[in-house]
Curated annotation (Swiss-Prot):
It comes from Pyrococcus furiosus (strain ATCC 43587 / DSM 3638 / JCM 8422 / Vc1). SMART domains: DALR_2 (SM00840). It is found in: Cytoplasm. GO terms for cellular component: cytoplasm. One of its GO terms (biological process) is cysteinyl-tRNA aminoacylation. This is Cysteine--tRNA ligase. Pfam families: DALR_2 (PF09190), tRNA-synt_1e (PF01406).
Length: 477
């Protein structure tokens, strides 16, 4: 039974989607004015794994993720670079999508942009005005928070606390400090659109309410994002959406923990961030995924080079296991009998699979699931060391388990993809080069033999000489 931690209820709940077999999921996308960093990667890798696991369990998942392509930050950056705000946003949307593809994050089904939904936003604001939740001030349209009695149910924030010590700044047209903008009237030199309230642009919070509801309906299953969005963004989304629709809007709210740097949140404002592109120059994409998955998605994740190196080493351990299996399968025994060693190893594989699912069913606990993965890897390596003639059936059982891990975690994908004809052909070529090198060594033409070894190593193939015999395995760089 899958349980998820719901930020709305502050507890783990049995996951029951609104429609059996189908999950509708919205994840807040980036405001596109700069290069995405590891904090973004953490959130989107986490929700990618959540989506993958739901699909693995048989759910049909419809996933929507927006792009905020008009915002104060975009306008400010465009002024600094001399670009048109729309062009700047499109440039960083392209960069974001390239980075996600590199990290093997599956694309969302729909990527709505704010600027393509201005008419929908205006219509939504109009409904809030008609229902008495919104009013027009001198500089825009505002949502009147006190009209929504359940305000604060997600974050625990109380209206009276927002009012303490707060004041309406001169020039602001809102009635109360806690009210928030739905529509901002145009300022000189800023992008603007026509509306019944004059030219202007949307407020931030209204955008996600409109785009999620347009594609997923007035009620859907999962709304996700980083912890920093709980208040005010998601709190305000709930207020305006449930005020408009008159019923519960989202069933489960999921939030990822912060990436930390020396005890502080990684953020652009603090300048302590590392971009995804910088990381990809030093580490394979799977290493970054593995680094993220070693912690539960709700826990803080401390960024250190040592942590990434540790993730790389652990990932290499698993790749070594997979390669050991691959090598052993070339000479494995097809047998209808098992001995004590086979039964013992099979039990560890079976128990590892159970523990893996148990961990993932416990609010997508990837950290615990990985422990099960390493238990199986250790058992297989021990089996290969102790077995006189490894049994093919045991090795296939192990590969079946690792393929599940691959599907859910988004790692080893190239490895399993290469089980096709392409992999077989590449293996034949490698075997041929190994035989050629063997002959060169016999003829004492060591310079050429060493050249083959080094060239194969550059391609991720490591040769190991044991006397007159040579074995090979794949490595990650």
């Amino acid at each position: 039974m899958l349980k998820v931690y719901n930020t709305l209820t502050k507890q783990k709940e049995e996951f029951k989607p609104l429609r059996e077999g189908e999950v509708k999921m919205y994840v807040c996308g980036p405001t596109v004015y700069d290069y995405p960093h590891l904090g973004h990667a953490r959130t989107y890798i986490a929700f990618d794994v959540i989506r993958r696991y739901l699909e693995h369990k048989g759910y049909t998942v419809l996933m929507v993720m927006n792009f905020t392509d008009i915002d104060d930050k975009i306008i400010k950056r465009a002024r600094e670079t001399g670009e048109d705000p729309k062009e700047l946003a499109e440039r960083f949307i392209k960069i974001f999508l390239e980075d996600m593809e590199a990290l093997k994050v599956k694309p969302a089904d729909i990527y709505p942009r704010v600027t393509d939904h201005i008419d929908d936003i205006i219509e939504f604001i109009g409904k809030l005005k008609e229902k008495g939740y919104a009013y027009e001030g001198s500089d825009g349209i505002y949502f009147e928070v006190k009209k929504f009695p359940e305000y604060g149910k997600l974050s625990g924030v109380k209206i009276e606390d927002l009012q303490k010590g707060a004041r309406v700044e001169p020039g602001e047209g809102k009635k109360n400090p806690e009210d928030f903008a739905l529509w901002k009237k145009a300022k000189p030199g800023e992008p603007k659109w026509d509306s019944p309230w004059g030219e202007g642009r949307p407020g931030w919070h209204i955008e996600c309410s409109v785009m999620s509801s347009k594609y997923l309906g007035e009620s859907f299953d999962i709304h996700g994002g980083g912890n920093d969005l709980i208040f005010p963004h998601h709190e305000n989304e709930i207020a305006q959406s449930e005020a408009c629709f008159g019923h519960e809007w989202v069933k489960y709210w999921l939030h990822t923990g912060f990436v930390m740097v020396k005890g502080e949140k990684m953020s652009k404002s603090l300048g302590n961030f590392v971009t995804i592109r910088e990381l990809l120059k030093r580490y394979e994409p799977e290493v970054i995924r593995f680094f993220v998955l070693q912690k539960h998605y709700r826990s803080p994740l401390e960024y250190t080079e040592e942590g990434l190196q540790h993730a790389k080493n652990n990932l290499q351990r698993l790749y070594n296991t997979l390669e050991n299996i691959r090598v052993a399968l070339r000479n494995a025994e097809i047998s209808y009998t098992w001995g004590e060693l086979e039964f013992k190893t099979y039990e560890i594989i079976r128990e590892g699979k159970r523990k893996f699912y148990e961990a993932m069913d416990d609010d997508f606990n990837t950290a615990e699931a990985l422990k099960a993965v390493f238990e199986v890897a250790n058992a297989i390596n021990k089996y290969l060391t102790e077995a006189n003639k490894p049994k093919e059936s045991i090795l296939r059982k192990a590969l079946e388990f690792f393929k599940i891990v691959s599907e859910v975690f988004g790692v080893f994908e190239d490895y399993f993809r290469e089980e096709t004809k392409e992999r077989e052909e590449s293996e034949k070529l490698i075997e041929l080069l190994v035989e050629v090198r063997k002959q060169l060594r016999k003829e004492k033409r060591y310079e050429l033999a060493d050249m083959i070894r080094e060239e194969l190593k550059k391609l991720g193939i490591q040769l190991e000489d044991r006397g007159s015999e040579t074995t090979w395995k794949r490595i990650i760089t």
